[in-house]
Each structure stands twice: as C-alpha cells, then as structure tokens.
Amino acid sequence: MKNEIDIKKLRNIAIIAHVDHGKTTLVDKLLQQSGTFESARGDVDERVMDSNDLEKERGITILAKNTAINWNDYRINIVDTPGHADFGGEVERVLSMVDSVLLVVDAFDGPMPQTRFVTQKAFAHGLKPIVVINKVDRPGARPDWVVDQVFDLFVNLGASDEQLDFPIIYASALNGVAGLEHEDLAEDMTPLFEAIVKHVEPPKVELDAPFQMQISQLDYNNYVGVIGIGRIKRGSIKPNQPVTIINSEGKTRQGRIGQVLGHLGLQRYEEDVAYAGDIVAITGLGELNISDTICDINTVEALPSLTVDEPTVTMFFCVNTSPFAGQEGKYVTSRQILERLNKELVHNVALRVEETPNPDEFRVSGRGELHLSVLIENMRREGYELAVSRPKVIYRDIDGKKQEPYEQVTIDVEEQHQGSVMEALGIRKGEVRDMLPDGKGRVRLEYIIPSRGLIGFRGDFMTMTSGTGLLYSSFSHYDEIKGGEIGQRKNGVLISNATGKALGYALFGLQERGKLMIDANIEVYEGQIIGIHSRSNDLTVNCLQGKKLTNMRASGKDDAIVLTTPVKFSLEQAIEFIDDDELVEVTPESIRIRKKLLTENDRKRANRTTTSTSTH
C-alpha cells in the first residue's frame, strides 16, 4: 500500500494566466529545473505545454493539459487552464481536480478580464491562490502596482480572508529565476517550488475506501481508443480491475480497466497501482463522457455532475454549395461534417450541435466567437470544406423576460484614440464602468456591453487605434435586452456577376468603387463578394471584362494598370465582417465570402418578398 507519507508529498495545482503572460514558459522552466526532463536546462522545445499547432501559432492555450514534476521527493501535478473565457468549459473541470491555483500575472499589465473569469471560478471552488508576478525584468515593469491591482481584484471577487492572505513570488520565467522580493531574485525557480510545497495542501482523500473517480478530461489514441483523465477521489485502482461506470443521467454499465497511466513531465507511463489524490489516465472502458463517475463494482456511488457554462453564441455550419465546392477539401459531405462535429463534442463540453430540418445545415453553439472559430480553423486544417453563417447571440427567457448575454470588456488604448473608441462603444450600447489613465499616455477602459455589440467590433477597433489598441472580453451575465439594432455593417459589398478569371483591367476600373478583396487572375464565381463598396448599398459588378481591342492604334495608349493591395481577411475577420445574408466559405486553401443567394435575380426576388411582408 502506498503509505501516508506519499499522499503528504503530493500537490495538485492549476495554473491561471492571461494570454501571453508567460504561463507556458513558466511550466517549461519548472520542468527543466526539476530535472524532470533528462537534461536540466537541456534542449527542450519551447512552450512544451502548447501541443496543438493552432495553440503554438496563436499563443493561446485551448485545451487544458496535465504534467507532473518530481522535486525533492515531492510530486507536483500541474494542470494548465485555458486563459480564455470562451473555453470556460475546460476551466470548470480542471478546478475540480486541484487543491490550489497558481495565478500568473504580467508585471506590467496586471490582472486581465480573462484571469478574472478563471479566478472567480477558483474562489467559488474554495481554492487558495499563490500569485506569481512574472516578467519583472521587462521595461516598464511595476510589480508593486500589480500586487495592489491583484488584491483589489480578489476583494471585488469576494475572496475570503484566507484567500486574501496569499503568498507572492516574483519571477522572470524566460530567464528561469524567481524570488520573494522583486529586487532580489534567486539563481533559479527554487522559491516557487518551495512556495508550492509549503502553501498547497496535500489532497484530502480516503485511501482505504472503495475506488471512485470522475472523468474530467478525455483524450483519444488510435491504439487504445478513448482515454479518461481525472483525479482519484478515494481508494486505489489497478489495471484489469472490474469497475462500474455511471453516466451523467445515472445509467450504469460494467467495464474493466485496461492501463492505468501516470504523468511524468509531458509523458504518460504505465502504473501497477494508483491511489487517491493522484491525477491519472485510464484506458479500456470504451466510450466515456466527461463527468462520468467510475467506481468500485460493490459501491456504486455517483459524484455530482460537473456544471459547464451554457453557450452564448450560435452559428450555422453548412455543406459548401459554392461552384468551387470539393476542389480543395478532402471531407465535403454533410455526413463527414456531422461526424467531425460529434467527435468534437466528446471533449469540447461547452459546445452544442443540433441538426436542422435541412440535412446539409447544423446549428453549432459555443461560448464565443473565438471558441467556434478555433473549431472551424482546426477543421479547415484537417481537410474539411464548409460554409459558416454570421454568429448570433443566444437569447434566454428568464422569469418570463427575454434576456441577452453581456460581456465585460477591458480596453487598453493610447489617449489620442480614447474619444473615437468610447464613441464607437457608446453606439454599440456599451456602458463605461471604469477609466484608468496610466500617466504615460495610455488609458485602460472597463466596459459592460451586450455580446452582439462586440460581434464585428474587433476589426473596427484595430482600424481606429491603428493597431495599437488591446481588447479583451469575457462573458459576464445575462440581462434585459437593449433596444435597437447594434453593430450593423455600414458598407455594402461588391459582388461578382459571373464565374471566371478576374482580370486586372476590370479590377482597375472597380477600384474607385471601394476596396477590393482579390488579386488579378484569381478564379471567382457568381455571387462571390470581391470587395467592400464605398457606399452602403451592395453593387453587382463585372470583374471578368478584358479590354476592347477594336481601335488597334489606341489599344496601347492607356497608362499602365496599377492595382492597390487587396484587403485580406483572416477567418475571424471574415466571420465578423459578414451580414445575415452572407456566408464564409472555408476550405483548406482559401477563405472566401459569398452571398447566400448567388444570382442577382434570386437576391432581388428575396428582397421583394421581405419588403412586401414588412409593408403588410
């Protein structure tokens, strides 16, 4: 039997940090210095915790990962949490596995709204924080100010006296050093290891009781199938042990454990037996779902289901019906798209997928635009083709009143842009909650704004601040609907009237009508949007027209054609840009924007129908 000493030397901790505050780098350094990687400070791929391509590219952590460190006879399980509120479903489950949280805050930025979201959840779980002020060596670092901000945030979140009595460690994760004073850092991360060991309580568990654990994460491996990950609540587990699985509806079935896998560094290894308090992965139980309880066959007791925040944004995923459908993607049918969405549901708990009366269309709901755009981007990289509609917020009936979701927004801008940003947010029904000038020419603004007011705002915001502004948002609450339309696009679009190759000569003539989105010699189709009109109406244009060569002598007299650089949209920008009658066509090679109705006649007919119904 694993003795009591071992449990006393076990620590389970989650890391919370805002995007780009250095959490992943911090974990890398802890792994290296603890000697968990063979060579301390050896050749380790940077940002080891971000395993998904998209995560490394965007620098955000989407899926929570587990890792374990051995340090001076102690075993520290570290679980990474996503820093973004759109992945709130992940956060809830992680917190159910740990006994404390490590809050990493940038020594210049201070706490951000995403950190606020996860910290609030951690306090609700009764966890005590350890605060790490990171990047203390960066220019402009103001660690004392940041500590005050963190304290104020904790008070606002209703922290208990115990939670407010938190230890503070100052660090520079990039250099791998930490200390108890920001002027006096040690040679390595030892002060942080010591703080974790001293301040995190060992798991309070019953070792001799019958086995019980809850699945809080899932993984999949082609060789062993579904892998369930969770913390053992009580008792112990061995490979080949018979167990009972209880799902969230209370239905039970029998199973037999395959392997029991422990974590060390970023690897998993097989264990002969694992005990209460440890975070393990188990195989061999077939289809598992998050929140399932696995327990001893003689003591069938379910643990309470994990609650997950409801989705706030919905959009339609449709089969690609454009004339170029199937040219670039590997998976294009509705069956393939539905299978992929159902596979995503297994581990992406905050996602909802509903079939609609139209077999080629699925309604997909999630925690926010980012949550859904990450899924679309992953599908696109895997070879899927699909079309997606404009995101819409999900309204709820609460006590007989229709309510809409609101977001908390933190904006950091230069003072010269403050007026135009505040005006734009006012038009989108935002309410100012706080305004903090930093005395160095920048201002931090806190807003509460309806979620629909933020859809499509980020692009405008970047233009307004010439790319210097920072904008972070996280779901706040549901409240009464604010009247009126919000965030309608001001400009119309230029629509191609035929299918073929766009010619430079035609595009040159269209430049004065607005901004183009395509280069010359690109294949386009009828109904594809090729530019942004400078006025508010849509314009159907011919971009295939070559130069007439009737009068031979004059044919070369024109000035050379000069085309301005076209506007190129990323996936998120395209989703924010489109209107209700438009779709974003997503393929592994391209992102195109199109009208739902491709021909001008169909669009006119649809317009006539809507105007006649609205006049009656």
From Swiss-Prot:
UniProt cross-references to SUPFAM superfamilies, sorted A to Z: EF-G C-terminal domain-like, P-loop containing nucleoside triphosphate hydrolases, Translation proteins
Q: Where is the tr-type G domain?
A: 8-204
> Single GO cellular component annotation?
ribonucleoprotein complex
Query: Can the keyword S-adenosyl-L-methionine be found in this entry's annotation?
Result: no
The GO terms describing molecular function are: GTP binding; GTPase activity; guanosine tetraphosphate binding; ribosome binding; rRNA binding; tRNA binding
Cite a single GO BP annotation. Answer: ribosomal large subunit assembly
Q: Which cysteines are joined by disulfide bonds?
A: none
Write down the chemical reaction(s) this protein catalyses: GTP + H2O = GDP + phosphate + H(+)
Q: Which Gene3D superfamilies does the protein's record reference? A: 3.30.70.240, bipa protein (2.40.50.250), Elongation Factor G (Translational Gtpase), domain 3 (3.30.70.870), P-loop containing nucleotide triphosphate hydrolases (3.40.50.300), Translation factors (2.40.30.10)
> Residues that bind GTP, according to the entry?
D20, H21, G22, K23, T24, T25, N134, K135, V136, D137
Keywords in alphabetical order, please.
Cytoplasm, GTP-binding, Hydrolase, Nucleotide-binding, Ribosome biogenesis, RNA-binding, rRNA-binding, tRNA-binding
Spell out the subcellular localization from the entry: Cytoplasm
Q: Name one Pfam family in it.
A: BipA_C
Q: How does it assemble?
A: Monomer.
**Which family does this protein fall into?**
Belongs to the TRAFAC class translation factor GTPase superfamily. Classic translation factor GTPase family. BipA subfamily.
Protein's job: A 50S ribosomal subunit assembly protein with GTPase activity, required for 50S subunit assembly at low temperatures, may also play a role in translation. Binds GTP and analogs. Binds the 70S ribosome between the 30S and 50S subunits, in a similar position as ribosome-bound EF-G; it contacts a number of ribosomal proteins, both rRNAs and the A-site tRNA.
What's the protein name? Large ribosomal subunit assembly factor BipA
- Lineage, uppermost ranks: Bacteria, Pseudomonadati, Pseudomonadota, Gammaproteobacteria, Pasteurellales
* Gene responsible for this protein: bipA
